[in-house]
Amino acid sequence: MLLAAFGLIACSAPTVDLPENRSQLIGSDSSEQPAYTQPPANAQSLAIGEQQFFVEVVSTAATRQQGLMNRDFMPANQGMLFEFPNEAPRNFWMKNTLIPLDMIWLDANKMIVDIQAAEPCKVEQCPIYSGKAPAQYVLELNQGVLRGQVGDTVQF
């Protein structure tokens, strides 16, 4: 099953270092946008080692398909967690996604089974990103913020 979009909202947590320079903001070319913001009211806390993120959980076909399409900014401490009813091969693409992301595939035990860097795509024929192992969850974070690796367990 292909998802029509990938999205992520970046989260800032007390354990994430703040950038010294606003030009380091992820997904932003404007100093007007904060790197770290309060999480949305419906955000769920998620930890990977010492890092904490606040993620928007999407668990319906419609919300998974929308993902982070057309969002032009994500705070560094936020992300999006795609939740599926079972563990299976999961394929994603970046159609109309404007922010570079890291896609993190998690198995049913919430262990990281794959991590791939994904670039924005504004054309019709976007590359497909397929996890190397079946996954029940796929986490999207701003590209480069994750300090975890394959084999780490995510807490949520």
Which functions belong to the PLM regions below?
Residues 1-4:
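Sec-dependent signal peptide recognition
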